[in-house]
Amino acid sequence: MEEEVVLMKGNEAIAHAAIRCGADGYFGYPITPQSEVLETLAELKPWETTGMVVLQAESEVAAINMVYGGAGSGKMVMTSSSSPGVSLKQEGISYLAGAELPCLIVNVMRGGPGLGTIQPSQADYFQTVKGGGHGDYRLIALAPASVQEMADFVGLAFELAFKYRNPAIILADGVIGQMMEKVVLPVQKPRRTDAEVIEQCPWATTGRTNGRKPNVITSLELKPEEMEKNNIRFQAKYKQIEENEVRFEEIHCDDADYLIVAFGSMARIGQKAMELAREEGIKVGMLRPITLWPFPTKAIAAYADKVKGMLVTELNAGQMVEDVRLAVNGKVKVEHFGRLGGIVPDPDEIVDALKEKLIKK
């Protein structure tokens, strides 16, 4: 397939991009608002073209363990779900991180806690960047703010996952998953051959016909000293990721007196709020974390001595704001504005919050 420009939903873009980047398998289960990922893959039937496996599992728990099996054999495999379903996957995600298995997880967030609502939310930030499962592990977390980024981040997530032998997650929200935009789909990449997988993934369970020694994929280590060594090695890897893979976007920050910090769909709304504020003569810039982990701590800290205040806008009760406050270390006032339960604010609400929380005080 050649490069193609189409109008589609963010969820549909995930499915198309997965096929075009040469993914080997998808294992998932339908749940609103991300069901179109599985539906689109079923409609496209990639098993007839690229050979990609697409399977609706009997549950979210089954799906994440199928990902474990596929990733253990060195294959490019993925799953997708929405907030309650991702909670069910947490044990498997911890196992994937502990076994150092590269894979892609997509979370199109909806409101909670509990069953909550099918409307958009960003309340899974803590779960994603602080470790939703057990143990000291990290996920490489990408936060798209457009349908184009939904498509682009699939290939990027796989690239980073295999580079560091670590699970990666695309943390989107229901707005980005359901909205329709023009998207440029990449040229079709072929799936890797078995020989390429063996060469690129010498750690994988690819069989012994090539004469190599057996590989064992596990996160289990019963000797405390060895488990500590594993964890120390993991932390060294995470530090390397933090040093090399931070991504963020800055808009009109050079002359800003105030900074809006937002990710995902809220960054789009925040950018419009920034423009409205500037029309009123208020110099506002915006910083958008693209990687939620590794977090752009240094980039945010650099503005602590340059701006009068920061407003963190999120579709939650205040989660990323904690990382922003840690970044500035008390050097500048940081306030939060959020809407809960699936309500998406207007840009005017953010401007009003900026005035009330930062300017009038």
Regions found by a protein language model. Name each.
Residues E314-K361:
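Peripheral docking tails and interdomain loops at the edges
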Residues V6-E43:
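N-terminal glycine-rich anion-binding loops that anchor highly charged ligand groups
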Residues E36-K130, L142-F162:
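Thiamine diphosphate
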Residues R165-E250:
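Conformationally flexible catalytic loops at phosphate/diphosphate-handling active centers
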Residues L139-E196, E349-K361:
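Structural signature of the thiamine diphosphate
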Residues K9-A13, Q235-Y258, Q271:
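Glycine-/acidic-rich phosphate or pyrophosphate-binding loops and their flanking alpha/beta elements
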Residues G270-Y303:
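Generic long, charged, amphipathic alpha-helical segments
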